[in-house]
Amino acid sequence: MLEYVTKSESETEAIGEKLAARLPGGSVVALYGGLGAGKTAFVRGMARGMGLSARVSSPTFTIVNEYLGPRELIHFDMYRLSGADELFDIGWEDYLSRGAVCAVEWSENVEDAFFGDEIRVRIDKLSDAERKITIEGGPLC
């Protein structure tokens, strides 16, 4: 298990960047944290760590955003989903089979879709600026 305390959004992004630079294709990063905790900032850093220059935004309404480049990042926001069945309905298994890194916000809503090999990232808001980031699971922890 790895733990960090960040004092700004850019520091949160830097942790995501550091993690993603080492992730093999096909990794699933399950993100947990309340509204405004910094999940999207973390994914923005992940994209940068994967060499992607795309503008990363939360896919709350589209549910899925795909970022293509030297490596592929698929960004899910499960806030509006009520269970894993809905994730499978939008093609979860197809996304997994592409070998892309999948970052899943609001993972608590779809935990039954995971196979136990995901990397779990919990972001807790300590203050307006500070976040505690806990990373566990997967081959890197």
Residue ranges and their predicted role:
Residues 1-18:
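N-terminal pre-Walker A segment at the start of P-loop NTPase domains
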Residues 20-25:
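Phosphate-binding P-loop
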Residues 29-31:
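Hydrophobic anchor at the beta1->P-loop junction of P-loop NTPases
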Residues 34:
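P-loop (Walker A) phosphate-binding loop of NTP-binding proteins
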Residues 39:
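Conserved lysine of the Walker
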